[in-house]
Structures are given as structure tokens and as C-alpha cells.
Design a protein with these regions (language model features):
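Interhelical loop/hinge segments that connect adjacent transmembrane helices in multipass membrane
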Residues: 2-19, 129, 160, 187, ...
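Hydrophobic alpha-helical transmembrane segments
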Residues: 130, 134, 163-212, 382-387, ...
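Signature of the first transmembrane helix
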Residues: 17-76, 139, 174, 234-257, ...
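Membrane-water interface segments that mark the loop-to-transmembrane alpha-helix transition
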Residues: 21-33, 59, 64, 68, ...
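Membrane-interface junctions at transmembrane-helix termini in multi-pass inner-membrane proteins
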Residues: 142-165, 293, 354-380
């Protein structure tokens, strides 16, 4: 009884400390944001035909590939260098530098890919989407501005405000997309999504300047700091980009090797629930990241809190993943209806894969990146993506979407073990 009492007191104490630091707002905001996106997409999948939903999935996948290099990763610099800045003027200079430089890069990227879209050989089932793909591409600079606005709120440790703004922008985005789907199908989804990102990206930027930097004038950072920011951002972009490729290459290869919109639609539906396991780990990662940045030189603090975060994340993800695995069929019925019930076994396999990814890999990768150890993430990610693409090219023709699930389980486990070994060598006793 004494041990149980001590453990209970310890848990209550830790919870109270997290509450004071704003963890509640981050967790609640992240959960509500993901829930709104999920709940809204449930209506979109029911409004569109299976063929239309497959086409939308194809376009969003291509857009995701391009968004990897958006802003050359400068949003990540906000999360690190605004935190490390000594005064409000320096914070403003870094934030404004990131915004201005990312806008320049995004305009160049946009023009290049608008031209490339005109000559890209889309599969025959998707050839009629060329114009609509161009409209979707125009959304990129505004979406990136919105991401930068939200990154600033995290860097300023204003967790309550971050949660509120993230929730509001997500509600607006998903419901405008749903409205567009009911009015004009996938064309409406794309156009209304563009309008939402434009309004909130610019609107939140104006609000941020008034909130934190009213009366301050921009002064460019020193040359050495600029170089450091660019290098860090580029490394983070490459690392994140490689990881994003894990998410995107599955759909891309399915589209290329199968050339069937219905297969893409079924895979997307099966992945929705496992994909939302990231709610748990991303909420924790959003909250703890800045604290690991501030204490990155305190090895004892890093080791102690890494264990807490890893165990807590693993336990929560295991619990949620277990429920998803058990109730696979009801979850499919809730989200997409009887026409997709056959993908329940695929959902179960993807849930196992998502548990390995979110429960084992993500925490270590996120903390290493926050403390500037990006190169290790990059190396592990490069090896992982080579394995994934190579194995998928063998597995997809034989097993279809199930081949993707089998591949993901093995590759994610390899990456989780590799990153854990790196962390122990850098920060372990």
C-alpha cells in the first residue's frame, strides 16, 4: 500500500507541474484539432464518390511531396532560435527573417512546380486533374505562413493561445472543405481550402505582430546567425522531408503500380484511424520540445525527462492502439460506411505499424531534433526510406495495400531501434 501511495503522490505532483506549464492546453488543443479534421473528413468521404475521393487523395499526395521543401524548413528555425533568443527584439528579428526568406523561397518553388505540373505524366486515371492541381499548389505559401504563425506561439510558450488558434484554423479549414465538397465536389474542396489557408495565414500573422512585436522594427540578424539558421532549417527540412516521404511514398507507389483510384480510397480510409494515433505523441512532442531545447546541455535533466516522456507516450499509444485493433470493423463503419468494411484487416495491420512508429520511434526522433542532433535523424531516415521504397516495390505488386503495411512494420521497428541506440550513445550514462 505504501508503494502505491507514493506512486500516486508522484503522479499527482507530475500532473500538477504539467498543468502549470500549459500541457493541458497543448493536449486539448491538439486532440480537438485532430478530432475536427477527422470528423470533418468523415463527412467529405461520404459526400464524394469513391472515385472522387481517390482522385483527391492522389492530388493531396502530390501536394504533400512538394510541401516537403516549402520555405526550405525555416518554420523549424522559429521553434529553436526564437526560444534561444535573449530579448524580444532578437525574437522578432528571427521570426521576421524566417517569414521573409520563406516567402521568397515559396514563390520560386510555386512557379517551378506550376510549370512542371503542365508536363508531368499523370497516370491515365488522373490526367483530368492537371488544372485543379495547379489551384491546389497556390495554397502552399499561405499554408506555410499559417504554420509559421503557429510555430511562433509555441516558441513564445503561449500554449493556451497556440491551442486556440490551431483549433480555430482547423475547424475553418475542414468545414470549408466540406462545404466545397457539397457545392462543387473535389473542385470545391480545393478552392475552399485555398481560401481558408489564405485568410488564416495572413490573419494570424497580423495578430502575432500586434500581440508580441507591436512597435518593434525589423533588423536583420547577424550574418553568422543567418547562416546558422539556414543550415539548421535545411537539415531539419531534409530530415522531416525524408520522414514525410515515408507517409507519401505509400500512396504514390500504390497510385503508380496499381493505377486504380478505388485502391487509393480504400487505403486512405484504412489509414485514417491509425494515422490519428499521432495525436498522442505529437501533442506531447509539441509540449516538451521547447523544454529540451532550453535544457539540452543538462545531461542529467535530459536523461531523466526522456525516460518519463518515452514511458508515458508508449503507454498511452499502446492503450489507444489496442482499442483500434479490437474495434476495427466498427471504426470503419463509423468513418466510411459499409462500402469500406472489407478494409478492416488492413486497418489492424496499419494500427500495429502506427504503434511502432508513434509509440517507439517518434519520441526519440523528436527530442533528438529539438536538441539539434538532426544529422542522426537524417541518416536513420535516409536508410529507412531506401528500405521502404525498395521493399514496397516488391511487396505492392504481390500484396497490394497489405504489402505497404507489412513493409511499414519492419522499417519503423528498425528506425526506432537505431534512434534509441543513438540517444543512448549521446546522452546515456
Amino acid at each position: 500500500m505504501g508503494k502505491i501511495k507514493n506512486i500516486t503522490k508522484y503522479c499527482i505532483k507530475e500532473f500538477q507541474q504539467l498543468w502549470k506549464k500549459g500541457a493541458f492546453y497543448v493536449f486539448t488543443g491538439s486532440f480537438l484539432t485532430k478530432f475536427v479534421v477527422f470528423f470533418g473528413s468523415m463527412f467529405i468521404v461520404r459526400v464524394l464518390t469513391k472515385n472522387e475521393y481517390g482522385q483527391l487523395t492522389y492530388m493531396e499526395n502530390l501536394y504533400g511531396w512538394i510541401y516537403i521543401i516549402a520555405g526550405l524548413g525555416l518554420t523549424n528555425a522559429i521553434l529553436r532560435y526564437v526560444v534561444l533568443a535573449q530579448d524580444i527584439q532578437e525574437k522578432y528579428n528571427i521570426f521576421q527573417y524566417s517569414i521573409r526568406e520563406s516567402l521568397k523561397y515559396n514563390l520560386v518553388i510555386l512557379l517551378c512546380f506550376l510549370g512542371l505540373n503542365q508536363i508531368y505524366p499523370h497516370p491515365s486515371s488522373f490526367e483530368n486533374l492537371q488544372l485543379l492541381m495547379s489551384v491546389m499548389l497556390i495554397m502552399m505559401p499561405f499554408q506555410y505562413l499559417l504554420d509559421s504563425d503557429l510555430a511562433l506561439e509555441r516558441a513564445m510558450f503561449n500554449n493556451k493561445r497556440y491551442a486556440l488558434l490551431a483549433f480555430l484554423s482547423s475547424v475553418a479549414l475542414i468545414w470549408t472543405k466540406f462545404l466545397g465538397a457539397t457545392v462543387q465536389g473535389i473542385f470545391g474542396v480545393v478552392c475552399f481550402g485555398l481560401a481558408s489557408n489564405l485568410i488564416f495565414g495572413i490573419g494570424f500573422y497580423v495578430l502575432a505582430r500586434r500581440k508580441y512585436f507591436a512597435g518593434f522594427k525589423y533588423s536583420p540578424p547577424e550574418k553568422g546567425l543567418k547562416k546558422e539558421i539556414r543550415i539548421y532549417s535545411l537539415q531539419y527540412m531534409i530530415t522531416n522531408g525524408i520522414w514525410t516521404i515515408f507517409m507519401l511514398s505509400d500512396v504514390f507507389l500504390l497510385g503508380k503500380l496499381c493505377d486504380d483510384p478505388t485502391i487509393l480510397a480504400e487505403y486512405k480510409v484504412a489509414y485514417v484511424w491509425p494515422g490519428n494515433l499521432s495525436i498522442v505523441c505529437s501533442a506531447i512532442g509539441i509540449f516538451v520540445g521547447p523544454y529540451f531545447v532550453k535544457n539540452e546541455n543538462n545531461l542529467s535533466w535530459v536523461r531523466t525527462n526522456y525516460k518519463k516522456v518515452l514511458i508515458g507516450t508508449l503507454g498511452l499509444v499502446f492503450f489507444v492502439a489496442g482499442l483500434m485493433f479490437i474495434f476495427a470493423k466498427p471504426l470503419i463503419l463509423i468513418y466510411a460506411g459499409k462500402s469500406y468494411i472489407s478494409v478492416a484487416p488492413l486497418l489492424q495491420l496499419l494500427t500495429i505499424s502506427a504503434f511502432i512508429n508513434n509509440g517507439l520511434r517518434y519520441t526519440t526522433a523528436n527530442i533528438l531534433a529539438a536538441m539539434g542532433q538532426i544529422k542522426y535523424n537524417m541518416i536513420v531516415s535516409i536508410v529507412g526510406i531506401v528500405l521502404q521504397v525498395g521493399i514496397n516495390c516488391i511487396m505492392i505488386p504481390r500484396f497490394g495495400a497489405y504489402g505497404v503495411a507489412y513493409t511499414s512494420m519492419g522499417v519503423y521497428l528498425f528506425m526506432a531501434i537505431a534512434l534509441f541506440v543513438v540517444f543512448q550513445r549521446k546522452y546515456g550514462k
